[in-house]
Every structure is written in structure tokens, then in C-alpha cells.
Amino acid sequence: MGLQRWFYRGGRPNLMARLLDRGTAALSARGGGPEYLVALEVPGRRSGRIISLPLVVATVGGERYLVSMLGEGVNWVRNVRAAGGEVALRHGRREEVHLQEVVAPDLRAPVLKAYLKRATNASAHVPIDKDAPLAEFERLAPRFPVFRMVPRNSA
């Protein structure tokens, strides 16, 4: 089993992954790392406290997207849905956005493909080659939530 899969065995981060995620989220929130690495800030659906975690932004056609490499059951996806998509992203500065879920698999597919090219660690969780034809991504797309970022003032 690869290290990336070990970190998220069972679809949930283990202690080491949580510590690394916390550090990476803090770094990206302060503007460290590449521009496409952001800290997502979303209220916990049970606790209400702000949860921060690092995510990779995929860009397609000038639009920005977030993808769940672990699929539907992860907490950040549940928290985003519970918050009605109202979240903040940080990379040096705080940006309030509305995350609009992309439902149609044919619209998710190009985003998923762009995401895999940028987030190389995601390939351990998304069972497809980043250079596969778009039709293969369409078959896989329903398993991976995709959210389009809309600036809050234009949502």
C-alpha cells in the first residue's frame, strides 16, 4: 500500500495525515506554497467551529474548482453542504466564496482531469491515469464531488 493511501486508509485521515494537513493548511493560509494550494475554512456541521484544511484548486476555462479526492463521504464535503456552500479560502489573504456543486458527470470530468494533473498525490485515490480520455473521467466523475468557486459578492 502506498504512503498516500496509508494516510487516508478507510477514507479518513490517520493521525499523521491530520498533523500534515494542519501544517499544510497553516502554511497555505499564510501564503506559503504554490498559488493553487489553499486552506478551506468551513464551519463544522456539528461543532460550528471553523475547520481549516488544505485543498488543491483546479482551473478549467478560467473557473476555479475544488475536488474531493476521497469521494462523497469526507467531512469537508459534508460540512460544505451543511453550510450551504458558504466558505472561505485562504492563501495569504482571505476570500469568501460560495461553493456551487457541479452535478453533471460530463461537467465534472474535465475538472477531475485537470485536478489530477495538478494534485499528483490524488492519483493514489482516484483510480484513473491523468492522461486517460475524457470519456473515462465521465464514468468515474459521479464518485468525486466537484465544487465551482463563485466569489460571494456575485453568488
Which residues does each PLM region occupy?
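Extreme N-terminal tail/first-helix region
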Residues: 1-30
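Short beta-strand segments
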Residues: 35-69
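Short, structured beta-strand-loop surface elements
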Residues: 71-152
